[in-house]
Amino acid sequence: MTNAKLAPVSIVVILLAAVVVGGCGSQSNAAQKASMAAAGRRVSSAPLVKEPGQPGPVWKPVASIGAQPAAWIALRSGVTLLRFDQRLVHLALHAGSGEPGGQGWSYGDRIGTSEIHQILAAFNGGFKLSYGSGGFQADGHVAVALTVGLGSIVTYRNGTTDIGAWQEGVPARGVAVASVLQNLHLLVDHGVAAPTVENCILRCWGATLGGGSEVARSALGITGDAQLVWAAGEHLSPAQLAQALVDAGVVRAVELDINPEWIAGYLYVHHPGGPAGVPVVPGQLGIAGRLLAPYSRDFFTILAN
């Protein structure tokens, strides 16, 4: 999905400073200062924004397409939330070099040259495909067959994304599909957390390092007005993650990867030398290269339309 003329992408520095100072794993102090300095030359701070009449997170705008806010961040009870306006941005599913591997994908194992002037954000994908919890399809190629009823992140060829249970809500009839990533059953459906989030943690929501219930977790959801919301934190139970999404207005959501090594989200500051990724989850270990270098696992990017 491309436009003939791309408006400049700007990252708001006030929230990035707050997040980085909160401590984001592998980011060095020098890298923090460089990223913030680059951001500071381009943008100004933004006020707190609370959705009128809606209880829940306090959102701050962190990215704009031209003069229009396109992405917001909120930090709430140990959960980082990123919200994206699909009228201005679109989601792209990337194939990792090992998961699913292979050649011929439109979006491969790093943020590509066609994306570097469009990139707003990127974040981790789902469980390892060998775990048997879902499927992967893109560009008409099936890496792992899709399963009826599983939670599915479906991006259509018109650039929009929806989330739902496969063949039980998605895909939309008559709309061409570009990609699908499946992972487990829906974490949130009809604006309510799945009934298993309290009493079926390991079997239903994935094995954890050490067998604990509160580990690094992530998820992607969609609101009633079709905005995408990514949520992640370093010490979350399935119930805590689901509740944060519900509080953010999410009506359907898929849990993505879990455990510290695999959870990472970035916003990208644009400067003459190219985009620089700034981590958004306090304490995240991070991904070498911040998805601008080859990565073995599948992941998502958020791109300006």
Residue locations for each model-derived region?
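Bacterial N-terminal signal peptides that target proteins for export
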Residues: 1-11
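Short beta-strand scaffold segments in enzyme catalytic cores
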Residues: 73, 80-83, 151-155, 218-222, ...
